[in-house]
A protein has these predicted regions:
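Long, terminal "pre-/pro-" and other extracytoplasmic accessory regions
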Residues: 2-188
Length: 188
C-alpha cells in the first residue's frame, strides 16, 4: 500500500465520523422540535398550572363555546387547552358524516376558525364521540351547565362524551385554580 493510500484511510474515517455526527445532530434537533410541540399543546390533566394561569383571560364559558359552535354542526366534544403557548377553546362538531374542529374565540365567543378533521387519531376520537352523542338526549352544553351548577366555584374546561355500559355519559373536567375535578353527567 502506498503512503498516500495509507494517509487517506484516516481522512476517510474522519469524514465519515463527521457525517455521522452531523446526521445525529439533525435527528436530535428534529426530535427536540417534536417534543416541544407536544409540550406546548396541553390539557388540564397534563399541566393544570399552565391552564389555571391562562383561564382567567377567558370570558366565554365552555358551555357558551359549545353553543357558539352549533352553527358549524352538532358539538360532540369541547375543551380549553394551551396550544402553541396560548389559551384556545376547541370544539369538535359533526355535520352529516363530516367532522370539524371549531376554534371559538375565548374572549368574544365568535368562531375564529373551522377546519375539517383529517388526522387519523383525531378522526377516530371524533367518530367515537359522535357514536356516544347519537343516543344522547341531553346536549353537551346542558351537561356542562349542570356540572358547574353542582360544583360551586369550579369552571368546566373539557367535556368528552363516551358510552358507559351502552349508556351515553359526559366526562367533564372542572377546575378551581389548579384543583382539577372530574365528574360524569348522564346524557340519556
Amino acid at each position: 500500500m502506498s503512503q498516500d493510500a495509507a494517509r487517506s484511510i484516516p481522512l476517510k474515517r474522519a469524514i465519515m465520523k463527521a457525517y455521522t455526527m452531523r446526521k445525529d445532530l439533525v435527528v436530535a434537533v428534529a426530535v427536540t422540535g417534536i417534543l416541544a410541540a407536544v409540550a406546548l399543546s396541553s390539557r388540564a390533566e397534563d399541566n393544570p398550572a399552565a391552564l389555571a394561569k391562562a383561564l382567567p383571560e377567558a370570558s366565554v364559558s365552555l358551555d357558551q363555546g359549545l353553543k357558539a359552535s352549533e352553527r358549524e354542526g352538532k358539538p360532540i366534544s369541547g375543551k380549553y387547552e394551551i396550544e402553541d403557548g396560548a389559551l384556545q377553546l376547541s370544539v369538535y362538531t359533526m355535520k352529516g358524516d363530516q367532522f370539524s374542529e371549531v376554534i371559538v374565540d375565548h374572549k368574544t365567543g365568535a368562531i375564529k376558525k373551522t377546519e375539517k378533521i383529517t388526522d387519523a387519531d383525531d378522526l377516530k376520537n371524533a367518530k367515537e364521540q359522535s357514536q356516544a352523542m347519537a343516543s344522547a338526549k341531553v346536549s353537551l352544553d346542558k351537561a356542562v351547565e349542570d356540572a358547574t351548577k353542582a360544583n360551586s366555584g369550579y369552571r368546566a374546561v373539557s367535556v368528552m362524551p363516551t358510552l358507559d355500559v351502552g349508556k351515553p355519559v359526559a366526562n367533564i373536567t372542572l377546575m378551581k385554580g389548579e384543583d382539577v375535578k372530574k365528574v360524569t353527567e348522564k346524557l340519556d
